[in-house]
Amino acid sequence: MKWIASLLLSTVCFFGYGQQQLSAVSDGINRVNNDLLTSWLNDIRPEGEDLSKVEGSPYFLDEWVYGKVVSVRGERYGDVRLKLNLYQKELMVQPLNSKDSFLMDDSKLLQFAFVGQDSTHTFVRVQKLEGQKPEPYLDFYQLLVSGNMNLLYQPIVEIREPPKTTMATAGGRGAGFYSREDNFYLYNGVSLEEIKGARKPLLKALGRYQKEVDRFISDNKLKPNKPEDLIKIVSFYNQLN
């Protein structure tokens, strides 16, 4: 996850939430209440598989980072540090000036952000609208570009065994965390469409202004399969709307 965490994104500030446009979070003013917590990590850790021997890191960022949280009811919370386990899909929270850690109840979360000095990494939950009723909230996605068309990235971490040849040359190295890095989506407030980085499918998914976007890609020699170029393309598309 280092590449996406260190990518210099067009930074959105923290959050207002519109039907189509997602944005990132205004100052949190309250401390997280107990309704948003599922367990006290120092006390009641849910039982699971032993990950102590798995190489690498399952976290979006390895260190605790100052963050903000927004609940599905629109409540905003600050004064916390956050840590996101991508393999177990768990958001951990630690109040400032405290060593106690808690698990967040993700069913009650709408958005959260890691707030750094140089950039803010925002995660959102989105809904697909079918007919008159919205579907249940989906998993969290990292918000890379905000606008009429939002560019989202779904970080997925898996555990994989190394190839036998690698195990032999690496002295029997064991399983490690592996990050899938091709999970990009376009979200317009109604539909969520996965994009694989190929030029023609991307233009079709964007819908409008295909000629203008195609010319922008050619003039700037961009490659839609590169995350930094994909961000530029979707940002340009939003300028046309």
Roles of regions detected by a PLM:
Residues 40, 45-47, 54-65:
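Extracellular/luminal recognition modules and glycoprotein regions
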Residues 49-53, 175, 186, 203-206:
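N-proximal short alpha-helices
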